[in-house]
Structure formats: C-alpha cells, structure tokens
Amino acid sequence: MRNETSFERPLALGDVMHGRGVGRVIKSLHPDYQPGDIIQAKMGWREYAMVDANDPYYMIFRMHHTELPLSHGISSLAMSGFTALIGMRDIGQVKPGTRVLVSGAGGGVGSQCAFIAKALGADKVVGLAGGKYKCDQLIRHMGYDVAIDYKGTSVEAELDQHFPEGIDVYFDNVGGKLLDDVLARIRRRARIVICGRISEYLLAPAEYHAYKNIYRIGLQDAKMEAFFIYDYTENFTAYEATLAAWIRTGKLKPCEHILNGIENMPQALIHLYEGVNVGVMMVKVAE
C-alpha cells in the first residue's frame, strides 16, 4: 500500500481505494466538462467523486460514443481496449497471415486481444488461460481459435502443436517461465509485446524467473517491447473511435464480468488476483 509509482499514489489509512470508473458529471467548474457529460477518471471506490480536472493524476477522459453501453467505458472503450489495440496494432504489427499467442487471455486486456488481432487480419489466435471453464469462454465469447489450459496440460507440447512453424506475435500478460517457453518458439522477426507479468507481481525479486532463452531475440532478429498505456493519452480519442466502430460492426464484442453493489468491490479485487473473472472485472455501483 505504500509503494508509489509515476502514475499511482500510495494509500494512507482511511483513504478511498483507488480505481478508474465511469460516471456522469453532476456539477463542473471546469469549462471542458459540462453537467451530463460521461467521463472516465480515477474516481476510487465510491458512488460520488470529486476530481480535479487540472490534476493529471485523475486522467480524465470524456467518452464520445455514449450510445453504446457505459460499461464499455471500463472495458473495450477504455484502458483495456486501448492497451490491446496498441499492443496488437502499433507494437505487434499484426497483419493478414500473422499467427498470434496471448497469455492471460481471459483477463481484461486479453479478452479484447483476439477480436482486435482478427480485425487486423490475423490468421490464427491462440489464448492461454487457467482452467477448462475459462478456456471454453475464450473460444465461445472472446474470439480465440484455440485455448490452451496451462493448469491441465503441457503448455510446451501444446505450443509445439499449434505453432509448428513458430510464433509471429506474443502478447504477454504473464511473464515468468511462460515467456521463456515462448521465446524458445518464436519465428524470425517475431514481435513480443510486454503488457504485464502477473505471475510475478506478488513475488520477491529473488523469486523472479531466470530467463534462459532471451538470446533468441537476437538470434531470430525479433523485437521485444514493453509499453505504458498512459504514454499514449493524446491518442485515446482516436483509439476510442476505432474500437467503437468495430463494436458496431460486430468485429469486437466486449466481454465484461459485472458484479452489482459497491459492497462487492473487495470481492471483485479478489477475483482479479485469483483469476476468477472472465473478461473485464467491474462493479456497477449506481444506475
């Protein structure tokens, strides 16, 4: 709770828990925002929030496609969707014929990845998730062609089966040994997109995986690149327009895991770390 980053403040005892939300402006003293506007911002776990539009910490973004469900302002038309779009299109450079692998495929970002990759022309998209139920959801609701259950099968054997010629693009949400296994199977000029490393977030540095196959990036003339979504804020409106158009045409189908009632916020957070959620985890706190 005490760790401070460039984009998040530490929590003090009695603070409101942090979190982005979607809300309707009730009153505004800022000329850029009017009552009735629908915005995304760091509102915290509460039903009413007061945010400072002049403070970049709150990262306010006014939604433009409010005829679509407002829940999309936490999923596909928000950070999860923007992150998947940047990773697949701008860094992964997915194009017709590309073969794509996504880890953490059932999470908030992963649930957008297959739809976006296919909208860009990907030939095959394989997702990694934990458990038969979540893997079924990848194929039924998230656009994946193949789902690999890392809890119930040999991941390395499955990767060899589904990528006999190697992997073109790997969108990594997990890190650790899985990334090492993928590096052993990348094709020439592959792109590895580093989005997260949830397998190691709760580990001490001494417990981090020691990579053995990192040399293959140079050997295969590949590219590995990490990115931070808030470095791209000037493009958010354009990202929103692209994703909204895909939603309207059915190319992108937001997958959302919604709990009701502010009292369920702690449980929603637990679901995230336990991997229970399928799609973007959110809580509806008001009509």
Where are these regions (language model features)?
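A structural motif shared across PLP-dependent enzymes of the aminotransferase-like
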Residues: 43-58, 235
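Glycine-rich phosphate-binding loop and adjacent beta-alpha segment
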Residues: 122, 138-139, 177-252, 286-287
